[in-house]
Amino acid sequence: MGTEATEQVSWGHYSGDEEDAYSAEPLPELCYKADVQAFSRAFQPSVSLTVAALGLAGNGLVLATHLAARRAARSPTSAHLLQLALADLLLALTLPFAAAGALQGWSLGSATCRTISGLYSASFHAGFLFLACISADRYVAIARALPAGPRPSTPGRAHLVSVIVWLLSLLLALPALLFSQDGQREGQRRCRLIFPEGLTQTVKGASAVAQVALGFALPLGVMVACYALLGRTLLAARGPERRRALRVVVALVAAFVVLQLPYSLALLLDTADLLAARERSCPASKRKDVALLVTSGLALARCGLNPVLYAFLGLRFRQDLRRLLRGGSCPSGPQPRRGCPRRPRLSSCSAPTETHSLSWDN
């Protein structure tokens, strides 16, 4: 049983996607979890398929629009927006596998299990880290218009940051890539994360803590710091667009906290129990399992919401999307074709207007 002590009921990037009918946790009595298992089989496929449909459609449009407009290399934010859409698109591609596994069991073998689990984990982490990159880009875009502001980032530097983010995400995905496997459970094949017997509880807990710290705490800290500075700039600015830009800032931070904070807290509490080898009563263990299922589903929702928050709110993106749907595209040269928007010049006088590009008109 020791090898399965960290198997959780969520299909998140820290665990397998199914629970045991009998708990593998250190419980004071045998705990039969058929009711939790039944809830998981109903809840997980519905959430996975809904988010997959929204994520594939929304992020597919973002990728197609940016590539058609050839704006991906013009600014760091455009480059990171493209990477964010790619990460969310890859994440959405893994969700139908989770839904099928929950409904009828896993039938694709251990190699595919490790591949899908690793892709899920890497894209999940990459998405949150690119959100932090976009926040930092927005702060630099405003601060560089001020006296003694930081030097603007170059597209080449943005591409280097993107490579680092993906490498870090792959590092965080190593447990899923190495230890996910196909196995029999209660008469059905399951794709689960099962740590080797020789791995201590401390190592398992430290892995989960590192993922929460880098996958949630770091991006949240960067977002709050950058948007707080941007909010202060907006409060000092004048113009009719100031209030709308402030609402965008609040919406971005609030969406991140509401969607990801509950799952991160639930996972931290579960990790604390693991590290302390704390015993739970059967009802408490069931409540924890349901909480992990529901909050991990909530965390997945940002895969479908990111295109709305970070792209569709942008005026220039909507213009590019309409042009794409009409079958046109814009060249990337200094003299754009008729109907293609010009990139505004940034000056100290235009800082409030550039701040309004918090709706990501880049």
Curated annotation (Swiss-Prot):
Membrane-side (Cytoplasmic) residue stretches: 69-78, 137-159, 226-247, 314-362
Keywords annotated in UniProt: Cell membrane, Disulfide bond, G-protein coupled receptor, Membrane, Receptor, Transducer, Transmembrane, Transmembrane helix
Stretch list, region Disordered: 328-362
Gene3D superfamilies noted in UniProt: Rhodopsin 7-helix transmembrane proteins
MF-aspect GO terms: C-C chemokine binding; C-C chemokine receptor activity; G protein-coupled receptor activity
A GO cellular component entry from the record: endoplasmic reticulum
Biased composition (Low complexity): 328-338
Subcellular location(s) per record: Cell membrane
Biased composition regions of type Polar residues, renumbered to the chain: 351-362
Tissues with expression: Expressed at high levels in adult testis, small intestine, fetal lung, fetal kidney. Weaker expression was observed in many other adult tissues including spleen, thymus, lymph node, Peyer patches, colon, heart, ovary, peripheral blood lymphocytes, thyroid and spinal cord. Also expressed by melanocytes, dermal fibroblasts, dermal microvascular endothelial cells. Also detected in T-cells and in skin-derived Langerhans cells.
Pfam families xref list: 7tm_1 (PF00001)
PROSITE patterns given in the database record: G_PROTEIN_RECEP_F1_1, G_PROTEIN_RECEP_F1_2
One GO term (biological process): calcium-mediated signaling
Main location: membrane
Membrane topology: Multi-pass membrane protein
Disulphide-bonded residues: C113-C191
Positions of transmembrane segments: 53-68, 79-99, 115-136, 160-179, 204-225, 248-269, 291-313
Matches recorded under InterPro entries: CCR1-9-like (IPR050119), Chemokine_CCR10 (IPR005382), Chemokine_rcpt (IPR000355), GPCR_Rhodpsn (IPR000276), GPCR_Rhodpsn_7TM (IPR017452)
Topology feature Extracellular, residues: 1-52, 100-114, 180-203, 270-290
Task of the protein: Receptor for chemokines SCYA27 and SCYA28. Subsequently transduces a signal by increasing the intracellular calcium ions level and stimulates chemotaxis in a pre-B cell line.
Protein name: C-C chemokine receptor type 10
Native species: Homo sapiens
Gene that this polypeptide is encoded by: CCR10
